[in-house]
Amino acid sequence: MKRFRIICAVVAVIALLYGCSGNSFESPAGLADNPKAIPVETESPETELPATIAPTDPPEPTIPPLGAGTGSHILSYYSDEYEDYLDYYIHVPKDAVAGMPLMVFLHGDGEVSRLDLIPEGGISMIANEIYGESFPFILLEPNTRIESWTKGNIPKLLFELVNAVADEYCVNTDKIILTGFSRGAIGVWDMISIYGGYFSAAVPVSSPHQKGHIDYIKAAEVPVWTFAGNIGDIERWYHQYLAQNVDIINGCGGFGKFTVLHGCNHVQAKNAAYIEETFEWMLAQERGVIPEG
């Protein structure tokens, strides 16, 4: 019995020395399943954070991967509210970034229901001659299927399209420009009569408002520069109305300017009006800011 006790004591000492040596050993079978086993909690050392974090420059914002992306595209916009659609041509510069101006051009009768003619009949080719492929703006050219920009829900549908494109391409909402030629110019007058200061600049070329009446108070919220040629009865007839329009806009505290394009008939007036000076003026305007005389 005494010998048995000595053996047990020796075994206990050996086990104690083995456990303190830092070597691992396997637990006896069943110990891990023992519900009375108490887990040993270990504390992880706290990580000391730096007092300040060096600021980093935010990445340059880019166009989100929505819609058609960069380049020139022919697309269609459908409105659930009005159950109608507008086809449109859009040019997004290849180096486009968020915050670019948006220029909206309304065509004349020659392109009605002819979306395929928009690239040549609009102003994209003119802009390309001035700026090359890298426009300093996104160009939107909607296409109407009837000879009007003012009938029915077209103004509301057009406004909805402009808003959708502005949101999709993250444009600078303080630089949304509206311009148009001939019947498109009538649409410009109509749109600024309804939405006024939503736009940063308005340039109607070769046409006053069809009805000879606009909401001058609303139109005075946006700077207006209008043009007309001086060859042909139609162009000369426009002069009295356009001059009257800008005079009243100026009288309402707005900015109105009328330029006669000497030596130009109705068709020639478009190329004469859309020159680099005109584009730069449009791009320089900001929503809610009326330039000085």
Residue ranges and their predicted role:
Residues 3-24:
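Sec-dependent N-terminal signal peptides of Gram-positive bacterial secreted proteins and lipoproteins
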Residues 20-102, 179-181, 191, 244-256, ...:
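A domain-start/cap signature at the N-terminus of enzymes
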Residues 94-98, 147-182:
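Gly/Ser-rich "nucleophile elbow"/oxyanion-hole loop immediately N-terminal to the catalytic nucleophile
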Residues 102, 106-159:
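Active-site machinery of serine-nucleophile hydrolases
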Residues 117-130, 161, 206-217, 240-245:
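Alpha-helical scaffolding within the catalytic cores
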Residues 167-168, 174-220:
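Primarily recognizes the serine-hydrolase "nucleophile elbow" in alpha/beta-hydrolase
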Residues 225-293:
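C-terminal catalytic histidine-bearing segment of alpha/beta-hydrolase fold enzymes
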